[in-house]
Amino acid sequence: MSYTIRRFQPDDRDAMLAFARSLPEHDLLFLGRDLRRPRVIEAWQGAIVEGRIDSLIASDGGSLVGSAALVRDPLSWSAHVGEVRLLVAGDRRGAGLGRDLLEAIFAVAAAHGLAKLTAAMTTDQLGSIALFESLGFRAEAMLKDQVRGRDGVTHDLAILAHDVERTTQRNRASGVE
C-alpha cells in the first residue's frame, strides 16, 4: 500500500469529509469538534490560513487514508506548545502510516521552534497511545468523562506530552541528531 503525504489544501475539503465520515465516531471524539460536519472543515481551513493549524494528509489513489495536524496558538502563554492530532483509516493502522504522519508533523513543529507537543486520545485507544509513546510521548494527565458521544456515553481522555527540547538535548548528548 502506497501513499503520499502532503499539505492539506482547500480543494481537499470533500475528500476530508468523506474520510472523516468513514471513521467510527469514537475515533473522532478527542478532536473536540465533529469533522463530519462541513462547517467544521471550513473552520479548520480558516485556521490553516490564519497560521494556527498546520495540517498534512496522506492520500492513496485520490482517497485520504490519514491526516495529522499541529494546532498552535502563537499569541497565547503556551505559544511554545503544539497539539498534535492524528487520524488513520482503520485498514491502514499498524502499517507505519501513523508513524510517518507523526514524523512529518515533528518536522513542522521543529520548523516552528516548538518546545513541547501534546496529544489527546480516549484511554481505550491503546494502539494510538503505544504509537505516541514509541515516539517519546509520555502520559501527563487523564481527564475523566471528558468527551461524550452521540450515544450519551462519556469517555476518559488521556493527555500525552513530548518534551522536544529535552529529547533534542538527550539526542545531542548521545551523538544522535
Annotated model-derived regions:
Residues T4, E83-L87, T118-A120, I159-A161:
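Short aromatic/hydrophobic contact patches that present stacked aromatics
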Residues T118-M121, E133, R138-H155:
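Conserved catalytic-core motifs of GNAT/GCN5-like acyltransferases
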Residues T4-A18, D163:
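A short beta-loop-alpha structural element at the N-terminal edge
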Residues A109-M121:
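Conserved GNAT acetyl-CoA-binding A-motif
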Residues G82, D145-E177:
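C-terminal "cap" of GNAT-fold acetyltransferases
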Residues P10, P24, L29-D91, L102-E103, ...:
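Acetyl-CoA-dependent GNAT
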Residues G94-A107, A111, A130-S134:
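Conserved acetyl-CoA-binding loop-helix of GNAT-fold acetyltransferases
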Residues R93, A119-I129:
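Conserved beta-strand-loop-alpha-helix junction that forms the acyl-donor binding cleft
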